[in-house]
Amino acid sequence: MGVFMTERADLVFHNKVIDGTAMKRLISRLIDHFGMGYTSHILDQSKILGFQQATATSISLGIDDLLTIPSKEWLVQDTEQQRFILEKHYHYANVHAVEKLRQSIEIWYATSEYLRQEMNPNFRMTDPSNPVHLMSFSGARGNASQVHQLVGMRGLMSDPQGQMIDLPIQSNLREGLSLTEYIISCYGARKGVVDTAVRTSDAGYLTRRLVEVVQHIIVRRTDCGTIRSISVSPRKGMTEKIFVQTLIGRVLADDIYMGLRCIAVRKQEIGIGLANRLITFRARPIYIRTPFTCRSTSWICQLCYGRSPTHGDLVELGEAVGIIASQSIGEPGTQLTLRTFHTGGVFTGGTAEHVRAPSSGKIKFNEDLVHRTRTRHGHPAFLCSIGLYVTLEGRDIIHNLNIPPKGLILVQNGQYVESEQLIAEIRAGAFTLNFKERVRKHIYSESEGEMHWSTNVYHAPEYPYGNIHLLLKTSHLWILAGASRRSSIVSFSLHKDQDQMNVHSFSVEERYIYIFDLSMTNHRVKHKLLDTSGKKDREILEYSISDRIISNGHWNLISPSILQDNLDFLAKRRRNRFIIPLQYDQEREKELIPCFDISIEIPINGILRGNSILAYFDDPVYRRSSSGITKYGTLEVDSIVKKEDLIEYRGTKEFNQIQIKVDRFFFIPEEVHILPGSSSIMVRNNSLIGVHTRLTLNTRSKIGGLVRVERKKKSIELKIFSGNIHFPGETDKISRHSGILIPPGTGKKNFNQSKKELKNWIYVQRITPTKKKYFVSVRPVVTYEIADGINLATLFPQDLLQEKDNVQLRVVNYILYGNGKSIRGIYHTSSQLVRTCLVLNWDQEQNDSIEEVHTSFIEVRANDLIRDFIRIDLIKSTISYTGKRNDTGSSGLIPDNGLNSTNINPFYSKSKIQSLTQDQETIGMGTLLNRNKECQSLIILSSSNCSQIGPFNGSKYKNVTKESENIIPIMDFLGSLGTIVPKIANFYSSYHLITHNQILLKRFLLLDNSKQTFQVLKYGLIDENSRIYSPDPCSNIILNPFRLNWCFLRHNYCEETSTIISLGQFFCENICLFKYGPNINIKKSGQIIIVHVDSLVIRSAKPYLVTLGATVHGHYGKILYEGDRLVTFIYERSRSGDITQGLPKVEQVLEVRSIDSISMNLEKRVNSWNECISRILGRPWGFMIGSELTIAQSRISLVNRIQKVYRSQGVQIHNRHIEIIVRQVTSRVLVSEDGMSNVFSPGELIGLLRAERAGRALDEAICYRAILLGITRASLNTQSFISEASFQETTRVLAKAALRGRIDWLKGLKENVVLGGIIPVGTGFQKLVHRSRQDKNIHLEIKKNNLFDLEMRDILLHHRELFCSCIQDNLYETSEQSFTNS
């Protein structure tokens, strides 16, 4: 009491209400001043006082005491309003799903936290004596979080995968939950209904598997006699408390000295006193015995196991420690979380620092040092590439704010900001990167339809044969509405007579090749769909004649339109041409040209210049399969050589104006063999041979004649000239000439001393074998007459040739090979000598020169039939090059000049020019493919999928005209995608205008009421970047950018601003159509498919925003069903510790399914150890030591990983339990070679100790390597087949055991239980092992082991200098790996 009086002056007098925190502080000070005994007396007095007062006041808890916070209602309303705006942004595709989720979570989290903070002040002001308030905030019972759920709102919950559900529970427990909120709350908490049920079943199955692995592990001996041990020392980050727990209950494997004094001896059990002494003295690494060091895998000894956790003494003999270990690990699994609770970026304070404006003013910064980006919520922002100063100019003061690199500026340059407005966000430093994880989020289609994207994509390299594409930039993905092909009747027709249906441009990556089989009877066409983009095994889908679709009562035959190869083939093999095969037509049987051999030849980029080849026809008459020489340069008449002008080779694809007439040309056949240089030739040079003469061992001649042999560097060229040999006299004129053609009817002088008339052309060639001697070869000649050009009327229908335009078409025949050019017909190839070409040209006006034209294929519906046209758009190149041109020719796949056919030698024969009537600017070229079919499509639109906007007739608005001398680029892209929805204005494009009488082409369409324009109907796909895509779902073709948005301006360079509606353009919902004029909004997102004079028809579409790096599942134009996977986003989110936590993490490690697989590291270590040690010690020692060291490292790594998971959840498990499990998982090795086929077979799993004993006993080494088995696999690889069969795969296990003749020694618990025997534990233990025999075995084994150990030590000491550094380095690396991985 005297002490109390002396220190009373130091104590502070408290006269206030104290809560739980203040009570803790008071108790702490009482203990410091008075000690434990006196403090407990004081606390007892306060407890009694509290009970007395509570009894007197009779405070009780009732449901009426739970008062909801008044501000909750308007807070939730405000949050709902924000969420509604967010939903609208998502609906308009301004943000994507991940950004929406993040933002939604943050909004609700902020609301919930605000309500939590409001709770205490609200109680204090309204009802300070509220029992709930008194109970929770005094610290008596309950915490703020629990009371918040009672009177505030439950807030956000997680789904079973650990993702936050963005639909919060707005109600509190006082108000009651709705059915949806109740189900979400069942998932939500750690003690939730669903969580508990699933966790119990998972933990139960884990326990069962663990029991299967270690049920036979029993303490059978006191000491196994091992000298092995494991060194333990406090690891980095390990607390002293955990290290003490690791030591207590273990047995020392070696003596411990402090200087010369021994403080602990071998085989001594470590208690709490010894453990504290070891830590205090900081003893060197302590060597202890663990289950890893025990000499047998089928049992364990007392000293290796250590203290029993039940009674605090050494474990008793006969105790089933394996069962205890498996239950110790499995049972706490019900306390572990099944998942990690992620907030999806809720706690922004930890990851980013906000910068707010100190006062109101104007923001200024250097725009050159920033670039546009998006925040993680989808808001527009500027990313600072380097450190940047932002100036805030207020009325009286100027503030300079420093934004570090990678900071985000959230306001625009020159924007006025209010005080405390958020202007920038500074990202956290590099140390937070370790706490992030990359997560995938899959987005599924909400409706059925056709997929289109509006940017370039590239094929994912890891899926070479799949349909997965990666996005190169932020853009929109559209799902165009439409029912699937399963619908049989089309209820709504969009296209009227002579409407344009489709546009095919020429930047095509065609995924299907259509094969026409014209050999079928009755001229039925069988169509095969051949997939070229898939794997090597191509799948052919056949559509029979009966496979039809009913459309408006007309039969629909699925027939393909254009034969187009894959893009690679187009560039290399097809020489940039598109082939349109024509169907067989009975009416054209008698015509000279079979129509199905005509091919269209158009460059990939679709641009043709003047005098370009548009189409060609290879006449089979001019096709030769044999070798020979073409001649048309010199002719001889009446033995007088007349040399006509030779036609020079012009290396250009354009036709020159001067044409030289060649009526005929000649082909001189010959047989050519190109043989390897080492071939042995059986004929002599300049000798005459007959037909079928053997030339080499494997080659015979097809014709007889003169043999010419010419040796080259690496080959031998052997030619055989058919014909006669003539030895001329002195008077022969012909001897002076070599290589001349003689026409028929010429006198043949001195040939065989007679004079005859020649019936056919012959070719005379002088051959000089020696300087003095020579002779003449007279060879037969094949003569080809070149026919006149084909009349255009045979190619194109008459009605279309009557159109007025200024385009000229002429048919030109030209020879593909030059004069004297040799043609090699080797390996059964044929050569085309003459090609008939359709040459395109147009009239050039003086003031209006057009240099090039754009070509495209279109489909036009006419009288319920589809007609295919080639559309040619004349382009004025003087204006159009001012804007940015993105021609696909520069993409690297196709050369810019399109038709770069180097093997075409333009020798022109007769040309027949047919001028078509002039006046207009276009040509409507008729069908090359005249198909009789109704409009068919696999996507069927109904009236519910389309909406009409208009009419616009009553609207009056003015056009804004601005005079300018310079050329003004028309395209105007506004900001980054997702910030401002771009105004749909200033889009110029080419339009096809169709009326019922003529086919015309205009360059643009102005939706202007003052200019009553024309009926425009075009069906194509043009995205917001004005790229045209083919909507033909049969072919699934993707069309890369084929730009039609040329910057057309008037001649006076006057820019006229009007609303330009592009056909095929995509609109987001709620966009105003007209900038100046009537307020007409689009009510639905979609694509314009029909433009009338006074209205539009829009096909409904659902837009999705996708960002850079997102993965798109499916090809362009793919038909998706509701619920199909559409996009996968990869994003980062905060994590705590591990990506996978709780029970799945434990299972992942025990089944060896880790992401950074331990087994991979294990394999590398084994190989490195085997290499080093086998080289020095030989194979048996090398394999043994390598496997031992590797397994030891892996065991420690596994134990640390599992303990880390349990400790993170607050569950304490002793290491020895985990060690028993891990020992069984790592106790097997895999026989890798057939070293001793009569002992072990390759691939057999054997115990490590058994392999070591066999290796020492046998002369030959057994090659094996360490392997990690998962617990399931380890359960099926035990010594008892009865135990294995009772776990899984009963039939397979028993059949295998019968075939191998396995014996089960019934040493475990389970097999004895199955057979009804006494289990060998507890009282039944002594029946299995006799004590006397056991002691005897122990003595012998200790002796043997020590001898072996001494031998090993001698070997290692002897070779220490040789390989010590190698082993230490490798051991250091592997141990570092194991500890860092753990």
From Swiss-Prot:
It catalyses: RNA(n) + a ribonucleoside 5'-triphosphate = RNA(n+1) + diphosphate. GO terms for cellular component: chloroplast; DNA-directed RNA polymerase complex; mitochondrion. Pfam families: RNA_pol_Rpb1_4 (PF05000), RNA_pol_Rpb1_5 (PF04998). Signal peptide: none annotated. In plastids the minimal PEP RNA polymerase catalytic core is composed of four subunits: alpha, beta, beta', and beta''. When a (nuclear-encoded) sigma factor is associated with the core the holoenzyme is formed, which can initiate transcription. Belongs to the RNA polymerase beta' chain family. RpoC2 subfamily. This is DNA-directed RNA polymerase subunit beta''. It comes from Dioscorea elephantipes. The gene is rpoC2.
